[in-house]
Amino acid sequence: VNGPRHRTTLAHPTPELPVEDVVRAQRHYSEALGFQIGWLDPGGGIGAVSRDHVAIFFRQRSRPFEPVVHWIFAADIDATYDELRASGARIVEPLERKPWGLRQFTVEDLDGNRFYVHCD
């Protein structure tokens, strides 16, 4: 490759999580995690939610499927932890400093997908 190349700009990746029921997942993320419901495919097999700079797609899958893990940075980890606990999120690992130096907690959705919410 000779000479300078123009590089386009990319944004954050958007995960697509496997779920049994897209509408149920959207409702859970809205009520327990503070996301806004975005769109739903007319067939109901794919949909989205968003919050701040995070967007998540859901795709209906039949079990068994492999749940996924994603890391989400929280600028104010204490406030985020308190907010999600108060809203009924399923926190499966409490807020603590991990051996690798991050303060983090783990949230699990209704389909077993997990989010490691962390800060430096």
Residue ranges: model-predicted function:
Residues V1-Q26, V68-H70, C119-D120:
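N-terminal beta-strand motif that seeds the catalytic metal site of vicinal oxygen chelate
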Residues L10, E16-A55:
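Core segments of cupin and vicinal oxygen chelate
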Residues H12-E20, A48-S50, R61-S87, R103-E108:
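Vicinal oxygen chelate
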Residues A25-S30, L84, D109-G112:
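Conserved active-site tyrosine of GNAT-family acetyltransferases
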Residues H53-F57, E66, G112-R114:
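Short, charged/polar, Gly/Pro-enriched secondary-structure boundary elements
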Residues A74, D111, H118-D120:
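A beta-strand edge to alpha-helix "cap/lid" segment located at domain peripheries
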Residues R97-G101, T106-E108, H118:
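C-terminal structural segments of small proteins and small subunits
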